Amino acid sequence: KQTIQSAQNQAGGTGVQQTQDMTSIVSDIIVNTNTETGSKMIEEVNNSSTENNLSLQVISGISEKDTTKLNTLSENNKEQMDTLTESAVKNAGASQEDADLIATVVANANEDFANQIIGEVTKNSTEENQALSAKVMKSIVESNPDKIDSLSDENKDNMISQTIEAAKNQSEGNTNDDVDLTNTIAEIITKSNDETATKVLETLTDTLEESESKLALNVVSNLTKQENYE
C-alpha cells in the first residue's frame, strides 16, 4: 500500500522527490510476482482514487515488461483489468505523451484487449480531450501500423472520424491544441498501410462535403511535407 501511495504522489507531483520511478517498481512487482500478489497490487492501484495518470503508467509498464503477463491478466483478472484500463484512459490527458503510453499498451495487447482499450479511447475522446483519438492513432501507426488492422471496424471508424472532427474543429478555431492536427492526419495517412490511409482519405472527403472548412487544403499542404509522401 505504501508503494502505491508513493507512486501516486510521484505521478501527481507531490510528496518526497523519489530518485526511483515508483510506477516502474509497481509494474515490476505485478510482472514478477505470483498472480495473487499482482492482483492485490492492481487492486490497490484501482483503489487509489486520483486524477493523475498512475493507472496508465502502471498498465503501460506491465505491457512493456511482459506482454504475456499483460494478456493473462486481461483474461484471468478481467474485472480488475477492466477497472484499471477504464481509469488509465479516463485520466489520460490529450497530451502526446499519454497517447504514446496508451499506444504502447495497444501494441502489446491481444486483439480483444486492444479493442477494449481503443473503445475506452473513443469514449473519452471528447471536449477538452477531443484530440486523444488522433494522437493515439498517430502513435500506433508510427510504431506498429498493422495493429490498426486488428481493431474492429467500429473502433477504426470511430477513431478516424474523431480524428478528422478534432482537426476540423481546430481549423475552424473552436478548439486549442499545441499540435497541428492537420499535420497529424497527414502523418497518419503517410505512415498507415494502404487500407487505413484510404479509409482516412474517404472519411476526410465525406466530412468536407458537408462543410466549407479549409481542412482538406491544410492536410494536403502537410502531406507534401512528409518524408515518405509520393
Where are these regions (language model features)?
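Non-catalytic all-alpha helical scaffold/repeat segments
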Residues: 1-230
